A protein has these predicted regions:
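Conserved PDZ fold ligand-binding element
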Residues: 166
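Basic/polar, cationic surfaces and motifs that engage anionic cell-wall
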Residues: 1-23, 57-61, 66, 80, ...
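Secreted/periplasmic proteins that engage bacterial cell-wall peptidoglycan
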Residues: 14-68, 163
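A short, structured beta-strand/loop element
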Residues: 69-72, 77-79
Length: 166
């Protein structure tokens, strides 16, 4: 699994003190990039992209908001959760295997890293239909894969710093 660091510029963010759950979302857009989401959320007056990760349709995973920062993805649940957004509109579309596989790998990695047992969809915590009725929750969240490897990092300033801190 490879996680690409986006190096997005954020405004001031609070540090999250605990990680108890993962909340899954869809972008409600058939096509979008990390930069699109960041711009949309800045235009909402937020610090930047509210999700911690974006999984693209081709299976590429992007790190958006730093993992240790409070998200802006699920009102009332941001202080103890990580948010993962999946490119697509799963009210209408059917997720393809590349995106399912990448999402499953990311969820399993984060569950192992943080000792998380709780994975939810946005509509479990807020009055919304996100991530849509076609979202393959069981295929992504309820996998019992073990031995998930640490993700490789694309070379870059943040990846280099993270590697040196590990």
């Amino acid at each position: 699994m490879n996680i690409i660091n986006t190096n997005l510029n954020f405004k001031q963010m609070d540090t999250r003190s605990s990680t108890q759950r993962i909340i899954l979302h869809h972008a409600a857009a058939k096509k979008c990039s990390a930069e699109d989401i960041h711009r949309w959320h800045l235009n909402n007056g937020w610090s930047g992209a509210g999700y911690h990760f974006l999984v693209r349709k081709d299976g590429t995973i992007y790190r958006l908001r730093p993992e240790d920062k409070v998200g802006a993805h699920a009102y009332g649940a941001n202080y103890d959760s990580l948010g993962i957004c999946f490119e697509g509109d799963y009210k209408e579309e059917i997720m393809q295997e590349e995106e399912i596989k990448a999402g499953r790998e990311l969820v399993n990695f984060l569950k192992n890293k943080y000792g998380i047992n709780t994975v939810q969809v946005h509509k479990n915590v807020n009055a919304t239909n996100c991530p849509g009725d076609n979202f393959p929750f069981d295929q992504i969240a309820n996998s019992n894969e073990t031995g998930v490897s640490k993700p490789s990092q694309e070379k870059g300033k943040i990846a280099t710093i993270q590697t040196s801190l590990n």
